Amino acid sequence: MKTFKNKEELLKEWEINGACKDGVEFNKSCKDLQEILEKCPLKFRRWRLIKGYVQFAEHCPWEEMKGWEWVRLLLAQPQYEDKCYWGKLTGGDWADLLIEKQKYEVKCDWEKLSEADWDYLLYYRPQFK
């Protein structure tokens, strides 16, 4: 988990971490690290959290994340499960999550899974039959 002391450290990391051009430009447009952390748009913030940049969690608008965004984040960084708005996950989102992380079966809203979602899930994880 990478943390930064200042904007310059962050900019240096962003030269090598595969960040998109728009994300780099956003960083440069801010006056300091605190402004970056506070004002970072969700579309950049979720990528940064997935990559393990934990400082971006503090000002995250968790309630605005969509189900598929939660799946991607939880697969990469399960420590954020206590922030998750589980009701945002669709049946397809649940299938994607459960295929990779069966531990979330206790959280699953099974009624959201359609027949197609069940077929998909059971193909990869027949133990859920």
What spans do the regions from the language model cover?
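Ankyrin repeat (ANK) tandem alpha-helical domains that serve as protein-protein interaction scaffolds
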Residues: M1-K129
